[in-house]
Amino acid sequence: MKEAWKAGHINRWLASNCFGDYYTRKGLSLAERELVTFCFLMAQGGCEPQLTAHAKGNMNIGNNRDFLIKVVSQCLPYIGYPRSLNAISCINKAVEE
């Protein structure tokens, strides 16, 4: 995954824009940035591979499975059951990896 940015021009743009710009700005901690990214991807839907990757990223920096499940539960009234259930599946998949 760390070398994915080399796999084509869109991946290079993604790495340069998101991780070279947004993730280097001041004001939010890395844990807060990962959580915001996780929430946005969860609400957007249709991007489960990215949601799984960011669930794993969250867990790697201390936002554990139980915390992420609570976040999903908090967002449920706004994003609905299908996206919430998909997010929980992504969290569980990230735990298994």
Residue spans for each PLM region:
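Acidic, glycine/proline-rich low-complexity segments that act as flexible tails and inter-domain linkers
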Residues: 1-30, 60, 76-77, 82-97
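Short, glycine/charged-rich beta-strand-loop motifs at protein surfaces that mediate ligand recognition
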Residues: 26, 39-45, 58
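Solvent-exposed, glycine/polar-rich loop segments of beta-barrel outer-membrane systems
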Residues: 53-55
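C-terminal structured interaction module
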Residues: 57-60, 66-68
